[in-house]
Amino acid sequence: MEIIDNKALLLRLRNPKHVTTVIPKSKELSDNRVLVSWGMEEARVLRNLNIKAPSPILREYEWTGKYDPFDHQKDTAGFFTMNQKSFCFNEQGTGKTASAIWAADYLLNKGIINRVLVICPLSIMDSAWRNDLFTFAMHRSVDVAYGAKDKRRKIIEGDAQFVIINYDGVEIVQDAVADGGFDLIIIDEATHYKNPQTKRWK
């Protein structure tokens, strides 16, 4: 695979029709080559065809925040944008939170999502998530749904682009969460949901 002028992907395939019949913005060239527009939808379709196309986030996103991302953080953010459901098994201390924030910010910029719910342990709602959102996406509105039930509900029903809530808090206001307009959910330390017999998992 070759990136052409930062706009298109040049593929060499045994069966070019395999791609050109499902991607309108593609063109068959000579010698089993296919030129595909490098957009989010095209990259996702290529991924579904087992062609490892890079995420357009690597081309067009202005990495926000106080710190420049490492290459592995860019790769992780790209992975998140290419997969509607994903798990991240990167080692502790590798900047997974920042990668998730950048991916969410990119999807917000593209209009693919409108609102993000972050579910995490109570102990890191402020110290990690709120602080990291202010560090890496200071232009986004953030609120923490914590405290009395009515207070949590009011925050969820508000207009913050990122809402942070702890695991048990989801159960307290589950109806508000379901109606909150969240189209991206980030679960930090998802192992807390590993047992399907628990209320938390359900």
Segments (PLM) and residue ranges:
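SF2 helicase/translocase NTPase motor core
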Residues: 18-29, 51-78, 82-85, 94-202
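The Walker A (P-loop) glycine that initiates the GxxxxGKT/S ATP-binding motif of P-loop NTPases
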Residues: 90
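Charged, low-complexity intrinsically disordered regions
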Residues: 1-53, 110
